[in-house]
UniProtKB/Swiss-Prot annotation:
Keyword Repeat attributed: yes
Presence of the UniProt keyword Translocase in the record: no
Sorted UniProt keywords: Membrane, Repeat, Transmembrane, Transmembrane helix
Cytoplasmic side: 24-151
Polar residues bias spans: 59-78
Organism, as annotated: Saccharomyces cerevisiae (strain ATCC 204508 / S288c)
Transmembrane regions listed in the UniProt entry: 3-23, 152-172
Organism classification: Eukaryota, Fungi, Dikarya, Ascomycota, Saccharomycotina
Compartments, as annotated in UniProt: Membrane
Protein's name in the database: Uncharacterized membrane protein YFL067W
One Gene Ontology CC term in the entry: membrane
Region (Disordered): 26-88
Extracellular side: 1-2, 173-175
Annotated membrane topology: Multi-pass membrane protein
Length: 175
């Protein structure tokens, strides 16, 4: 009977020892290891490595350096290049070249050619022609013919009105 009680006590002791061992070993140590190893160290590494380092790397590399490069390269340099090349060069080339070519060249050519030539040709020649031909000639001829017609009409009217008087005067002269 005592041996049975002793074996039960040893069995209970072994169970308690194993439970405590499993409890300390498995639950506490691995949890701390998992906590420290997995959660703390990798989180710090991930935080420092990925978030801070990579963040600084990304910021410096992508945002700051390329933005400065893009700013200087794309916005400033090409803008200055495009500004100088397109606006100033092309401006000087196009505006002064084309301006002088088109506006002065075409202006003088077309202006003097069309406006002065056409002006002299159209306005002076046809105006003088039209003015002299139609207005002066027609005006003079119409004026003269109208005036002549008016005088003839006055003479005819005077002759008609004076016909009886003339006839009476002729009859009396015969007597």
């Amino acid at each position: 009977m005592e041996s049975i009680i002793l074996s039960i006590a040893i069995f209970i002791g072994v169970l308690l020892g194993t439970s405590v061992g499993a409890g300390s070993g498995s639950s506490i140590s691995p949890d701390v290891d998992a906590g420290s190893g997995s959660r703390t160290s990798p989180d710090v590494d991930a935080g420092s490595g990925s978030r801070i380092s990579a963040g600084v790397g990304t910021f410096s590399g992508s945002s700051t350096s390329p933005d400065v490069d893009a700013g200087s390269g794309s916005s400033t340099s090409p803008d200055v290049g495009a500004g100088s090349g397109s606006s100033i060069s092309a401006g000087v080339g196009s505006r002064i070249g084309t301006g002088i070519g088109s506006r002065i060249g075409t202006g003088i050519g077309t202006g003097i050619g069309s406006r002065i030539s056409t002006s002299i040709g159209s306005r002076i020649s046809p105006d003088v022609g039209t003015s002299s031909g139609n207005r002066i000639s027609t005006g003079v001829s119409t004026g003269i013919s109208t005036t002549m017609n008016a005088r003839v009409a006055v003479l005819i009217t005077a002759a008609i009105l004076s016909a009886p008087v003339t006839a009476i005067a002729l009859l009396e002269a015969r007597r």
